[in-house]
Amino acid sequence: MLNQNSHFIFIILAIFLVLPLSLLSKNVNAQIPLRRHLLSHESEHYAVIFDAGSTGSRVHVFRFDEKLGLLPIGNNIEYFMATEPGLSSYAEDPKAAANSLEPLLDGAEGVVPQELQSETPLELGATAGLRMLKGDAAEKILQAVRNLVKNQSTFHSKDQWVTILDGTQEGSYMWAAINYLLGNLGKDYKSTTATIDLGGGSVQMAYAISNEQFAKAPQNEDGEPYVQQKHLMSKDYNLYVHSYLNYGQLAGRAEIFKASRNESNPCALEGCDGYYSYGGVDYKVKAPKKGSSWKRCRRLTRHALKINAKCNIEECTFNGVWNGGGGDGQKNIHASSFFYDIGAQVGIVDTKFPSALAKPIQYLNAAKVACQTNVADIKSIFPKTQDRNIPYLCMDLIYEYTLLVDGFGLNPHKEITVIHDVQYKNYLVGAAWPLGCAIDLVSSTTNKIRVASS
């Protein structure tokens, strides 16, 4: 009897012990994916940024930890993909413009975990190319892109996040991105670097100024402030930023052709005879009988930049724009985009390296050589010159030198950093505004998205 009772008690105890364990194991299995889901939301965030530039469209996918430190995606610090031409090339076919982004959208969805896509913000910033389209062409393209994102993507986006990026936004994002990568954000403004971003349609200058300079800042003629107050990495900055529309590298060519009163242009290489198309307008490209001249090209470029335009304030750059007053925030300068690209084609920059120290005078010296060379011989001297840039090499080099020296007031022998990428930890990160946009977007939207989704 005792043995039977013992056996019965043993069975009851076994059932009693096993039952909670089985229930507990079911609860654990149910919580594991939930816990993983919550942890991933708390510890990492993604942002998808489309850069719809004048020469092409690019997508950047960034991954951040909870402190907005960049985390790798695969073997790289970001996912990047590009396509050509830019959206503005589809001015008469908005749907084709939107469809040109499909490969980029597919690529982004391939790297962001599916469970995070609904709370991953997506923003498209169109820059100078779309700004210059006439009528409602730009808005029709943007609406087609909004429809694409809404119908074919699971990313979190809003109509106002697919828009033409204001030039000052572009400049401030670039400044934030480069200073973030250099580890300058959070430090005194004197430790930050100025940025000059020479795009295709516009050029942006941005740098931090003192409180004293901020107090004296004049009002821009268009009503927009010259200075933005930014709070980044627990530090307040007075950020001078201005975007010069129509003064990017490609738009600058058009301005120089407009400034020429003759059919021939002293900036065109000898042997050139054709047309340059920009913004829906064709410009005659023909060198004078004596060939191009760097001196006459420089005079024409100064005229195109409106260097001598009336300045109603204390100090101006060009075209009557306030220069920000200078100061320690402009002591160091990082110049990007076409400054690197053109510099690489004439040997100022070695493309084996993500950046290089250079001086404005080097662009002038290269121009002196290019301007006295026949279009058929330019490759023998500058073999890395892209074929599409050959007719304009003299013009481009003179333009960049004049922009830096006469426009922004740099000493011809001042050493600046010309960059394509920035070394960040063990990675190279592209010097572009999308990173600054991503930092701003993630920090301002992540909590809102979570609350709305819960």
Swiss-Prot record:
Residues 1-7 are cytoplasmic. Glycans are attached at N151, N262. GO terms for molecular function: apyrase activity; ATP binding; nucleoside diphosphate phosphatase activity. It comes from the Eukaryota. The active site is at E170 (proton acceptor). One of its GO terms (biological process) is nucleoside diphosphate catabolic process. Residues 29-454 are extracellular. The keyword Metal-binding does not apply. It is a single-pass type II membrane protein. The chain crosses the membrane at residues 8-28. Its main location: membrane. This is Apyrase. It comes from Solanum tuberosum (Potato). The lineage of its organism: Eukaryota, Viridiplantae, Streptophyta, Embryophyta, Tracheophyta.
